[in-house]
A protein has these predicted regions:
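Acidic active-site catalytic centers that drive phospho-/nucleotidyl reactions
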Residues: 33, 57, 109, 147, ...
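Conserved catalytic-core segment of NTP-binding enzymes
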Residues: 66, 87-101, 115-221
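Short glycine-rich anion-binding loops that position phosphate/pyrophosphate groups of nucleotides
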Residues: 111-113
């Protein structure tokens, strides 16, 4: 269980090989995606980085509003457009702005409508393409947010997303309740994608860097 070298880095790594470092965040609605982005922004800001958020989940007015609230809580700027704006346009603006304002990192929230795979696939591809036009190699990370409490369902969602976007890391939320740890390790091993962060509560500080050894040990404690 403990042997998956990629998710060893238990300390928070805020050093990027390039600037701005672009992170695209994916996941279905209701898994805590926007909340996780807010908490990540807070972590990076605390580490002394210039952070920018991009609200490219434009089909859900609540998502943009929610991200705006988190941007205020974390005290970082946000790039947004009106509801139903083209997500790729928002992503483009975010990356362009991050570059112009010398930001260290941009976190871009994207829509998670898995029921319409074709359009979502096209949208993701377009978002990646426009980001890459502004900053070479962007997005440098693609994080998939999953609700650990949904068990097998989380596994299916993870597989569905990996079909059309290269996931580089997992964020597992709602781990503050009963032991749902097995699914965390299961998804990571099955997809061969490291778990980067775990969400253990509602507060801004409640996103932790994943430490596999510590995590597995705590699973087997009485």
């Amino acid at each position: 269980l403990k042997d998956h070298s990629d998710d060893k880095p238990a300390e928070f790594d805020a050093d990027f090989p390039q600037k701005p470092h672009i992170v695209m965040v994916v996941g279905v609605n209701g898994v805590g995606k926007t909340t996780s982005i807010g908490k990540l922004a807070h972590l990076y800001k605390k580490a002394g980085k210039n952070v920018m958020l991009g609200a490219a989940d434009t089909f859900r007015a609540a998502a943009v509003d929610q991200l705006k609230i988190w941007s205020e809580r974390a005290d970082v700027p946000i790039i947004q457009q009106g509801q139903n704006a083209d997500p790729a346009a928002v992503a483009y603006d975010t990356v362009e702005s991050a570059k112009a304002k010398d930001a260290d990192i941009a976190l871009v929230d994207t829509a998670g409508r898995l029921h319409n795979k074709k359009s979502l696939m096209n949208e993701m591809a377009k978002i990646k393409r426009v980001m890459g036009k502004v900053v070479e190699g962007a997005p440098h990370e693609v994080l998939l947010v999953l609700d650990a409490s949904t068990g097998q369902n989380a596994m299916q969602q993870a597989k569905a997303f990996t079909d059309f976007v290269d996931i580089t890391g997992l964020v597992l939320t709602k781990l503050d309740g009963t032991a749902k740890g097995g699914i965390v390790i299961g998804i990571s091993n099955e997809l061969d994608v490291p778990v980067k962060y775990i969400g253990v509560g509602e507060e801004i500080e409640d996103l932790q860097v994943f430490d596999r050894e510590l995590f597995v040990n705590s699973m087997f404690k009485d």
